[in-house]
Amino acid sequence: MFYYKNWERFCESLSKCDVTLCTAEQSLRLPKGERFVVLKHDVETFVANAHRLATIEHKYGICGSYYVQAYLMSDSENIRLLKEMQEWGHEISYHYDVLDAHAGDYEAAEKDFIKYSKVFADNCFTYGTICQHGNPVKKRVGYTSNRDFFRNKEIRSHYPHLVDMVVNY
């Protein structure tokens, strides 16, 4: 069971360590060999819970990376909470699920990827990293996971500015 008081203790301890605490995007610009920690969160249901984690991290000067599923962007309260998190320095990015959503149809998946990326941009969330959503019980034919979307060289070539934290890191 998860307890916020334990997350608070963890963040407090982490803030005292001799290591760079950064977002996933910031980690890409660190000097080679620098020790760092990225707190990466997949936001798949409750933005309010993610906001609570971000509040604790912010208290200790930690900025995490929050990968948000696109459907959550349809709620104005979620957007408000995510914007506040972004103002604190947290990375708010896209937790994509497009290849599974379209049963391996890359063309349809890319259309959704473009559509949902625009939703993030229209709400002033810009990002340089993304992360795929994993669904271990999904039956797939012709592809192995959402990771395959950015493993596809043609699709990858359309987004040279993005780093998939699972595929490219």
Label the model's feature ranges.
Residues M1-Y4, G89, K153, V163:
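Generic detection of intrinsically disordered/low-complexity segments and helix-coil linkers/edges
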Residues F2-W88:
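Active-site beta->alpha N-cap acidic-glycine motif
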Residues Q26, Q69-Y71, D97-L99, Q132-N135:
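An acidic- and aromatic-residue-enriched active-site/binding cleft used to recognize and process polar
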Residues D42, H95, I130:
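Conserved, mostly hydrophobic/aromatic
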Residues G64, I92, Y127:
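Hydrophobic anchor at the start of a short beta-strand
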Residues Q69, H90, Y94-E107:
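Structural motif corresponding to the early beta-alpha repeats
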Residues L99-Y169:
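Catalytic domains of cell-wall/extracellular-matrix polysaccharide-remodeling enzymes
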